[in-house]
């Protein structure tokens, strides 16, 4: 796929697989699993003005779940955002065919419903890694995440979990996907004579 002019996008494992396919490496994050809300993701210098982040705040939170992370950048990689948990939260990889790859470590495609399901699925693992201290805690957190789907989200919930527009507003939360379509896919499509 990288040898074609087709633009590619991937989140989480998508970024990791693309990194390895392009010659970089991935490792288990020594800080453990980043899960729930990835905090204070900051657009890097190279990310300012990049198509992925048009209309996105300079520092934002995002729904996330990952244990692995990019360790060594592949040749032709530009880091677009970072945070204290993982130095590569988003990247662009130049590809031989010119289509390019844009990827995020976090999940702009997730809603609170998806991350709530992840908490239920990983409950025992989260307790083992001391992200929760008692067995019922992950399951108890799930209804709170479902409640965040309401518009507007309940104010006590917003305060308790430190949620803001970047994760609560679907248009802001998924902006990277729309930007990729508008900034990479549609221009590539039009160069192929497709409207």
What residues fall within each predicted segment?
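Amide-donor transfer/coupling interface in amidating biosynthetic enzymes
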Residues: 3, 43-195
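Cysteine-nucleophile active-site neighborhood
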Residues: 1-47
